[in-house]
């Protein structure tokens, strides 16, 4: 579900009552060191959920792996690995909308790590392979992150007209 309604500083809630808790995505992170976030989300009043975070029961857990390009660009690629009703769902989200509109905080259980693999297909440019080793409630899963499109070069508009050499122009002050 699209989370689009901010409740307070540590949770985000959608129109149908799904709440997400996790780490802050309001700042730029380094790709290898800080590019993974562990988020719990679900209906806060639902008892018997698989997770309890800060006294709240949450039925779904998600792992977000994102890549922020060179600052000041905020374009990101997110891999979402979540467990709901004993099934794994993997979804890829691209674009700056997650980075700009979501605020997740208080996630310390960052147990997803990046594992580069050498035997991936050579005809695609891969960023890395993301491996989650599993927990008591979630089986291990591995997702290969690919980008089919080439990296775009940013052009800077720094053109200016030719300047005259050794010429100083003085203008009279009106005051």
Swiss-Prot record:
Report the EC code(s) recorded for this entry: 4.2.1.1
Q: In which tissues is it expressed?
A: Sclerites.
Q: Does the keyword Zinc apply?
A: yes
UniProt region (Disordered), positions on chain: 1-52, 85-104, 115-175
Ranges of Basic and acidic residues composition bias in the record = 24-36, 115-129
Q: Where does Zn(2+) bind?
A: 38, 40
* Record keywords: Glycoprotein, Lyase, Metal-binding, Zinc
Entry comment on modification after translation = Glycosylated.
Query: Per its Swiss-Prot or TrEMBL entry, what cofactor is needed?
Result: Zn(2+)
InterPro entries in the cross-refs: CA_dom_sf
Q: How is its activity regulated?
A: Inhibited by diamox.
What molecular function does GO assign, one term? carbonate dehydratase activity
**Which positions in this protein are listed as binding substrate?**
137-138
Give me the reactions it catalyses: hydrogencarbonate + H(+) = CO2 + H2O
Residue ranges annotated as compositionally biased, kind Basic residues, are: 37-46
**Primary role:** Reversible hydration of carbon dioxide. Also acts as a structural protein, having a role in calcium carbonate crystal formation in the bio-calcification process.
So what family is this one in?
Belongs to the alpha-carbonic anhydrase family.
The entry's protein name is Carbonic anhydrase
């Amino acid at each position: 579900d699209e989370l689009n309604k901010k409740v307070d500083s540590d949770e985000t809630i959608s129109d149908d009552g799904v709440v997400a808790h996790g780490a802050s995505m309001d700042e730029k992170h380094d790709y290898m060191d800080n590019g993974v976030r562990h988020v719990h989300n679900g209906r806060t009043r639902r008892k018997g959920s698989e997770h309890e975070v800060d006294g709240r029961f949450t039925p779904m857990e998600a792992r977000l792996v994102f890549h922020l390009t060179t600052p000041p660009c905020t374009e990101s690629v997110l891999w979402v690995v979540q467990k709901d009703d004993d099934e794994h769902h993997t979804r890829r989200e691209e674009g700056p909308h997650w980075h700009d509109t979501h605020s997740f905080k208080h996630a310390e259980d960052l147990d997803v790590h990046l594992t580069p693999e050498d035997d991936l297909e050579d005809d695609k440019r891969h960023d890395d392979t993301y491996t989650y080793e599993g927990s008591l409630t979630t089986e291990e899963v591995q997702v290969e992150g690919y980008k089919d499109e080439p990296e775009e070069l940013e052009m800077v508009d720094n053109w200016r007209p030719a300047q005259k050499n050794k010429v100083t122009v003085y203008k009279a002050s009106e005051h």
